[in-house]
């Protein structure tokens, strides 16, 4: 069901708190998914772990993590904790293409040290650039 009335966007402080909490959760997920192959494969895993393979592994693990949570309720655990929900710009749940596009478009902001926060400060609705481009928006849940 589309949003019947405008819904408030979370403030920058709430988003930053959610991002900090999310980074701890993601670090734990990545740690587990790096330790398991090393335990199962032993020394062989160390020989296979080139920097490029590690980067692709991280990218794919994070892709699955975020896209799955966004498609199943619009919230990661950190977003639930801070009462933030991701919806399409018309208020409906995300479609798979939107979730994937948002994930891919968010990387320049991550690589540039969170430059997307500056955009959100200037945006009339307080949304990130990658949300505008992907047709998504963050709302208070």
Q: What is the meaning of each model-derived region?
A:
Residues 1-141:
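Membrane-interfacial and juxtamembrane segments of integral membrane proteins
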